[in-house]
Amino acid sequence: MNNDKAGKNLTKEAPRSPKTRVGNYVVLGRTYDKCRALLWGDIGEYHFDCPLDNMLFGFKGVKGDDFKAEVEKGASDTEMAQWLDTHGEKKTPEEVKAWSDEMMAANPYENPEKRDWFVEQVSVYNLDPKTTTLFDWLDVDDKESCAMASA
């Protein structure tokens, strides 16, 4: 375990991109950064255990509180990937890769229940909702939010 119990200041820098894979899991690095910021930094406008985090937790069948408790022990992001591998629903490396690939391609525009919300979100940045993935939008939103915070 890592004894470095410090979190990012998410009012000054964004968590990792949801595209960043840790142990082949997309979203994990971002979820980890937000959890550490909640525990030992400044989470700012971000939220831990949010719908995006819950996509990861739901895929593995774990709870946000259990994830947080493990991070609180000082687990590194690599150790958290190993923890996910051994907790919740057993998933093969192929299943993790397939889920991560599916998440990378996810576009809320394709979901009639989320379409209007997504169109509104991406229009702020003049992005095409039909071709912009959820992760692409989050990356742009993070970059713009951090630029505004440092201005």
What label would you give each PLM region?
Residues 67, 71-125:
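Amphipathic protein-protein interaction modules
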Residues 33, 62-65, 94:
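Generic structural signal for well-ordered, non-membrane alpha-helices
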Residues 2-43, 103, 107-151:
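Polar/charged low-complexity regulatory segments
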